[in-house]
Amino acid sequence: LNKASSEKIGQTLSSSIFRNESFPNFGFEEVEQKNFSQEVKLGVFNMGVLVGVPFGELDCKTLLDLASLEKNVRVTPWRSLFIKNIKSFSHPNLISNAEDPMVNISACIGKPGCLQANVETRALAQSIAKNEKMLLGKKGSFIKGSTHIHVSGCSKGCANPSAAKITLVGQENEHFNVVVNGKSTDTPTEYNVSHRSIINSVEKILSSENGV
């Protein structure tokens, strides 16, 4: 629209291309703008509950379940949702516990969803998060708050362009290169690790980091 008027949504918009079009009122609400210097932890707050979205992706069923709550749901910059005016919330496809290992794992859509990907990523990321030897509170403790694991289908590293504690980079032979304290384009510390061995490799790195 070259000459769209500054009318609010719900009123008439004019342009040099289209005839006058009337847009419905979608019920947008003007809210107070706040600046956050760091990511807010998941959990219960005075005004509602903050839940995480694994890999930043919601399916239709989860969206419908959220809509059925009939609550004000807001999207945050941190792959999470803030549900207002609710005291507790649990959903199998969302993260409600700040200590859940899934909070610290990122993964691209991987194979077959992306033509550039060499490997499947999401199932591996979930397997790492559910590995008993890497859960919080157990020997070999999975990951302190600053630890992040990134599973990348290729060297592009789309899901996490910055450095992570461990970055697993999928190769054409469907094995992985392992980068420690770096991003997907950095020099690996391990090369050509098979899918079957990759969780053991991650566990070994984390155990040495935690002095186990």
Where are these regions (language model features)?
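Mobile "lid/hinge" segments at catalytic clefts and subdomain interfaces of large enzymes
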Residues: 1-21, 162, 167-212
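Small-residue-enriched alpha-helical segments and adjacent helix-cap loops
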Residues: 50-177, 203
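Gly/Thr-rich phosphate-binding loop signature of adenosyl cofactor/nucleotide-binding cores
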Residues: 13, 17-67, 72-74, 80-82
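Residue-identity detector for glutamine
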Residues: 7-11, 33, 38, 116, ...
